[in-house]
Amino acid sequence: MHPRPWSAVRASIDRISLPAAFVDRQALRRNVERTVARIERSDVSMRIATKSIRSVEAMRTILADGGPRMVGLMCYAASEAAFLSDRGFDDLLVAYPTVQPG
């Protein structure tokens, strides 16, 4: 598959208000397939770093397409874990120290 020409990408986002994120779903799925192929050669699983994704829909796609080797989400803060829990995610790891005021 060839990447989309920039003109096609531009035409698809001209009708929406910016700033906005544009995700090529085919490219995302190919990246998930490649990543899963690498980790299947070993005895490891993978947790998505939410700090790198920043899209609930993309996280859902990655977890669904990644199969049993994609085990959940690594959140940067407890507040983000709570936000994602409210959206139905149930395998959450808060990776950084959390300090509450008071």
Regions found by a protein language model. Name each.
Residues 3-8, 27-60, 76:
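N-terminal glycine-rich anion-binding loops that anchor highly charged ligand groups
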Residues 4-23:
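Generic N-terminal amphipathic, Lys/Arg-enriched alpha-helix
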Residues 18-23, 45-46, 66-69:
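Short, contiguous strand/loop micro-motifs
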Residues 23, 27, 98-99:
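Alpha-helix N-cap and loop-to-helix initiation/capping positions
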Residues 49-102:
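Active-site-proximal beta-alpha core segment in soluble small-molecule metabolic enzymes
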